[in-house]
Amino acid sequence: MKEHKARKRFGQNFLQDTRIISDIVNAVRPQADDVVIEIGPGLAAITEPLAKKLNRLHVVEIDRDIVCRLKTLPFADKLVIHEGDVLQFDFNGIAGKKKIVGNLPYNISTPLLFKLAEVADDVVDMHFMLQKEVVERMVAAPKSNDYGRLGVMLQYFFDMEMLIDVPPESFDPAPKVDSAVVRMIPVKHRIGKADDFEHFAKLVKLAFHQRRKTIRNNLKELAGDDDLQAVGINPQDRAEHIAPEKYVALSNYLAGKVV
């Protein structure tokens, strides 16, 4: 079969390190009857060992040439191939609690993570290869340089842990950045639940709009000092000093004031 050349427009970097591949599959812990979706199977580095353990494996792939390759693999009868853009894919269209795994294209990782948050209630767990810098932002704690909007929003939905450091030479072609594998497990009992999620999301986006400004300045169109203090937020603090549950509390407090 003709060798597949990685396509930059699809953000393709193919994992080839067998140790890393084994570590990822072991982290996923696939059981035969699990509902597993792999995003971006590429040259099937993770696909093959997953398929060996599963009765069926869903894969989402945008590259038509790779789709054609997948159909010729010895284990193709175990694959359910969904050709198309994962950003448009209906994860709820697959019944059952899902495990989702993938070496995610780094150029769409943030919008894809936000999309996946929307289906958190139907997910068992997720394991993704991402740019290490992105994973550090996802798992960051308040008062750290990496803590920001991405971390607040994803920590609302998931407990997350960085599992594996992955150097550039683990891929072909090698990316210019370090990578890491993150485990994401939907939280069973949130510290606080947003009464109006859209309002919560807007508030968090505004809070981190200008990181060097105080929370008072960034949220001036939504909240006054009295509102901030009512939920235990110091108006002089910056956004990165405020824990996710405080943003939830503030959003609910403000929503409760609207008549």
Swiss-Prot record:
Name of the top EC class for this enzyme: transferase
Database matches in SUPFAM superfamilies: S-adenosyl-L-methionine-dependent methyltransferases (SSF53335)
Gene Ontology molecular-function annotations: 16S rRNA (adenine(1518)-N(6)/adenine(1519)-N(6))-dimethyltransferase activity; RNA binding; rRNA (adenine-N6,N6-)-dimethyltransferase activity
rRNA processing keyword on record: yes
GO biological process annotation, one example: rRNA methylation
Binding, S-adenosyl-L-methionine: 13, 15, 40, 61, 85, 103
Superkingdom field: Bacteria
Compartments where found: Cytoplasm
Keyword Transmembrane helix attached: no
Role: Specifically dimethylates two adjacent adenosines (A1518 and A1519) in the loop of a conserved hairpin near the 3'-end of 16S rRNA in the 30S particle. May play a critical role in biogenesis of 30S subunits.
Protein name from the UniProt record: Ribosomal RNA small subunit methyltransferase A
Gene: rsmA
